[in-house]
Amino acid sequence: MAGTSIRGAARELLESDAVAQVVTLNEDGSPHVTAAWVGVDGDEIVLATIPDQRKLRNLRRDPRIALSVPTTRVNEWGLLEYLVVYGTARVTEGGAPELLQRLAHTYLGPGVVFPPMPNPPPGFVTRITPQRFGGVGPWNPPRGAN
């Protein structure tokens, strides 16, 4: 399924140090929510995991995923801006330490070594293809706005 381009303010937020809330679906249909560092690679959102976690098992079974990414901005109506991304994910083995190191520069600062262990395992990279955007902010103008 073709995705939606990540543009403007949505891209800026996803490339910032805002931590995403990641929602996958458990086998019984209930939501599984975790927090994750995210980045952008072309028109995909990427995140990395070293151990094989529940979110990865959920995504292998059902690739639907949602992210909620808060900002610190309040709009003219007093609402906190946040981005919601609905999409599909694919999990690949390997590359997690390299992606985590790249993201660590954004989230922790330059010169940080992450993961903080010698010879980390290859882990997993999740690549998310956005299908649509929502939330409150310039990526989703309010109804009735010009």
Over which residues does each language-model region extend?
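Short, basic/aromatic recognition patches
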Residues: 1-21
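Short, solvent-exposed coil/turn segments
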Residues: 7, 15, 31-33, 78, ...
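Alpha-helix boundary recognition
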Residues: 14-15, 60-61, 119
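Short beta-strand segments
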Residues: 18-51, 59, 67-70, 81
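Charged, gly/pro-rich active-site loop segments
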Residues: 1-5, 76-146
